[in-house]
């Protein structure tokens, strides 16, 4: 029997919801995103004048953004560039976006409930099918 090379999935779309940190160029420190935008994990904020699906919200102390489903790599990259440009244009001038996995924050940026909320709500263990217990904040390290 001859094997056929047919795609298993057709019309695959790829989205994304990465986080970025804020760096304060005046104080030379990482700055909490809490209070800069009204978007939350439960109610993300649509980015003005961009198509449906471009959203942003606070996640712990980071800014999280969402892109619409992309049909190909070029579209996916373009959506990320649009989102990063939008966020930079809508933040105070002294704040820059920093793309890295983790950052240490001064204690004055960690005194809100939001700054001490980690992970998805709720978050599940895929192997056990059970809800995970959210991690506790141990020090001033925050991760994306």
Language-model-detected regions and their locations in the chain:
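Terminal catalytic/cofactor-binding subdomain
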Residues: 1-143
């Amino acid at each position: 029997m001859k094997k056929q090379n047919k795609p298993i999935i057709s019309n695959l779309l790829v989205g994304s919801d990465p986080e970025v940190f804020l760096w304060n160029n005046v104080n030379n420190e990482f700055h909490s995103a809490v209070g800069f935008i009204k978007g939350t994990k439960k109610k993300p904020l649509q980015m003005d004048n961009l198509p449906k699906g471009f959203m942003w919200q606070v996640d712990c102390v980071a800014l999280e953004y969402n892109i619409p489903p992309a049909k190909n790599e070029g579209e996916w990259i373009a959506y990320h560039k649009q989102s990063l440009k939008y966020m930079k244009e809508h933040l105070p001038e002294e704040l820059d976006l920093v793309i890295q996995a983790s950052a240490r924050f001064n204690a004055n940026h960690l005194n809100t409930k939001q700054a001490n909320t980690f992970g998805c709500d709720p978050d599940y263990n895929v192997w056990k099918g059970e809800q995970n217990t959210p991690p506790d904040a141990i020090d001033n390290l925050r991760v994306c």
